[in-house]
Design a protein with these regions (language model features):
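Short hydrophobic/aromatic-rich beta-strand segments that constitute the beta-sheet cores
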Residues: 40-41, 51, 71-73, 116, ...
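Conserved short histidine dyad/triad with adjacent acidic residue
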Residues: 40-58
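Glycine- and acidic-residue-biased ligand/ion/polar-headgroup-sensing regions
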Residues: 57-70, 74-77
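Short acidic-glycine-tyrosine-enriched beta hairpin
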Residues: 77-100
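Short beta-strand His + acidic residue motifs that chelate non-heme Fe in jelly-roll/DSBH
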Residues: 51-53, 71-72, 98, 104-111
Length: 146
């Protein structure tokens, strides 16, 4: 059996300033990645609404760290079937999935930013991954590169 080169392990603290603006308009603080996925911290300002997007090749799992808000998700191509489009409340301790082909948009309640950590699988490939879609709310933040 051939030996594989091990990937060095890493430790990283959350940066004080964002590294980028996501295509949905959230402030992104990059954390770590491996071949199978990457982790980042996202923050949407209090009272703000993101841009609605879908992803071409990645799936995500989110964990809400702080703040409250709502998320809209719709499985593309299934708009008329019950249960495949919904709006749900978000708060600290909640986790959710964004499967491949899911359109989504979220908003933060007034009073505190909505802050979450997301695992992206496979790692975020870069520009061209996010595709703008029509969502239920009017965005209030500037979008980053798609």
């Amino acid at each position: 059996m051939p030996k594989t080169v091990p990937i060095p392990f890493e430790t990283k603290a959350l940066s004080a300033t964002p590294d980028a603006t996501a295509p949905d308009g959230t402030a992104v603080r990059l954390l770590l990645s491996l071949r199978g996925g990457s982790v980042a911290h996202f923050e949407l300002p209090a009272g703000a609404v993101s841009h609605a997007v879908t992803h071409r090749t990645v799936e995500e799992i989110w964990f809400i760290v702080s703040g409250r808000g709502s998320i809209w998700r719709r499985q593309e191509g299934w708009e008329r079937q019950e249960g495949l489009e919904r709006i749900e409340s978000l708060g600290p301790g909640a986790s959710l999935t964004i499967p491949l082909g899911t359109a989504f948009q979220f908003r933060a309640e007034a009073g505190a930013p909505l802050s979450f950590v997301a695992v992206t699988m496979p790692p975020w490939p870069g520009e061209g991954e996010a595709v703008p879609v029509h969502g239920p709310w009017r965005p209030t933040v500037a979008a980053g590169p798609t």
